[in-house]
Amino acid sequence: MDIVARIDHALQAALAAHAAPDGPPRLTAALRHAVFPGGARIRPRLCVAVAMACGDDQPVLTDAAASAIELLHCASLVHDDLPCFDDAPVRRGQPSVHAAYGERLAVLTGDALIVLAFQLLGEAAGAAPMRAAGLIGTLARGVGVPHGIVAGQAWECEPQVALRDYHRAKTGALFSAATCAGAEAAGAPSAPWLALGDCLGEAYQVADDIRDVVSNPDALGK
């Protein structure tokens, strides 16, 4: 199984395992809408690739970490598309979650994806609890404060911001978390992989900014 298929299989299993016939059906549908079809799955691919480079001796934990990273990324997109931020009508070639399901359900969808991400790590912790504990901290730093995705989004609410600080928080932090998480899932030191994630995240953001300027929005699917 190639890496993308492995990630999508893990994501499908995670959503299916946490859906219930007596749960809110529109929320269940919105969660799937937010995650599928996926984009390039760059961040979870980095996580799995680093884990494989480090031996990948706990694939269940690797899959949980990669899935959690993608769910956190999807949550950030759902929230970023909201009318109070970008008010984006399209995401990944289909209506954004708030365009398809309404603003209130979009907020709840993003929240639910964040909770599910950390729930997956907790459920996979049995085989290697110390590694899982480290992963929870790594991913929390990648999405939280003071330098994660939430901080990156918060910089948009400030009158002035250093562009590099903004890029590092909004984009780079989760790339760094992905490479470090891959190493941690495999029981390897994460420090050697931190710079790789930092550099890839910054390069990705610059490329994405250029693409936004020179490309047709319809071609971008966002």
Model-derived features: positions:
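N-terminal amphipathic/basic leader segments beginning at the initiator methionine
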Residues: 1-19
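Mg2+-dependent prenyl diphosphate-binding active-site environment of isoprenoid biosynthetic enzymes
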Residues: 23-222
